[in-house]
Amino acid sequence: IYGCEAYLVDDLQDLVVNSRNQSLEDAYVVFDLETTGFSTVANKIIEIGAVKVVNGKITDKFSTFVNPEVPIPYRIEQLTIINHNMVLDAPTIEEILPKFLAFSEGCVMVARNASFDMGLIEANCKGQGIEKEFTIVDTVALARVLMPQLNRFKLDTVAKAVGVSLENHHRAVDDAACTAEIFVKFVKMLADRD
């Protein structure tokens, strides 16, 4: 229909994937990836940012560029402000992934659009012969449940709605820290519902 804007929402999307009876009272890692594009099959990771949260507080950070070993498309440079020179001397995903997995060992993994970011992590694990199972929480799915009045669930929109500051948008560790603050508020909102 001309002039109509529509959104397809999977109402059956899981909030938690592969639950192993872990608790959010345990440590969890909120992470974000910047990539060369929007495909978990064809694109590469160029930055990993993560924060570890214990008792509702950020206790540790993990942040690194990743050399994708392919050129970064111009549109991605414009979006992330990450260019080829910034990643040229960075370690490759083969070097970084084991360090990221060690950082997040035993933690629930939390991400925005978790199927995309975890898809890339899982694909890289598979490519390196690493067998790993993750408990995954998607903050976008959670936002849809807790804040159905929002028309959009982009990071900046949700951050503004819950009163969280977002600085250096599209830089992985800053987006992860913002997502962590949002998630802490979501956990409180869920507790208040009980």
Model-predicted segments: where are they?
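Acidic two-metal-ion nuclease catalytic site recognized across multiple nuclease folds
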Residues: I182-D194
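Conserved non-catalytic scaffold segment of RNase H-like nuclease domains
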Residues: L24-F134, P148-H170
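A generic structural signal for short hydrophobic patches within well-formed alpha-helices
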Residues: I121, L142-A143
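Acidic, divalent-metal-coordinating active-site segment for phosphoryl/phosphodiester hydrolysis
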Residues: R171-V184
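Short, glycine/acidic-enriched loop or turn micro-motifs at the edges of active sites
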Residues: T35-G37, A141, C178
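Phosphodiester-processing cores and adjacent nucleic acid-binding clamps
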Residues: I1-V29, I136, R144
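Conserved RecA-like helicase motor core of SF1/SF2 enzymes
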Residues: C125, D138-A141
